[in-house]
Amino acid sequence: MRGALLVLALLVTQALGVKMAETCPIFYDVFFAVANGNELLLDLSLTKVNATEPERTAMKKIQDCYVENGLISRVLDGLVMTTISSSKDCMGEAVQNTVEDLKLNTLGR
């Protein structure tokens, strides 16, 4: 289920035309904070992105699921995230998007 949410988040990001170079660090920061189980760390991450109260509530519920499922669940999700992020397809897409962003930024000046 969470893997499907990751794919959906990445698709929405691309559909909205948001630059991957800007969103990836934010995504991984929030994901780490959620999976870590530390509520203060999650609050700090969500403050950086100006999360609304409903978004904060939803993320805290997801974090509660991680805490309830224990360390093994967190480690397994971390492995899945690493596997997806370091796959050939994902890396190729990231490089392609970065090159396109650099071209657009250079042409825009």
From Swiss-Prot:
Signal sequence annotation: 1-17
Tissues where this protein is expressed: The long form is preferentially expressed in the salivary gland, while the short form is preferentially expressed in the skin.
Main subcellular localisation: secreted
UniProt keyword terms in alphabetical order: Allergen, Disulfide bond, Glycoprotein, Secreted, Signal
InterPro entries documented for this protein: CH2-like, Secretoglobin, Secretoglobin_Domain_sf, Secretoglobin_sf
Record localization: Secreted
Statement: the UniProt record of this protein carries the keyword Heme: no
Domain of life: Eukaryota
Glycosylation site positions: N50
Gene Ontology cellular component terms for the protein in this record: extracellular space
Pfam families: Feld-I_B
Family: Belongs to the secretoglobin family.
Subunit architecture: Heterotetramer composed of two non-covalently linked disulfide-linked heterodimer of chains 1 and 2.
Protein name, as recorded: Major allergen I polypeptide chain 2
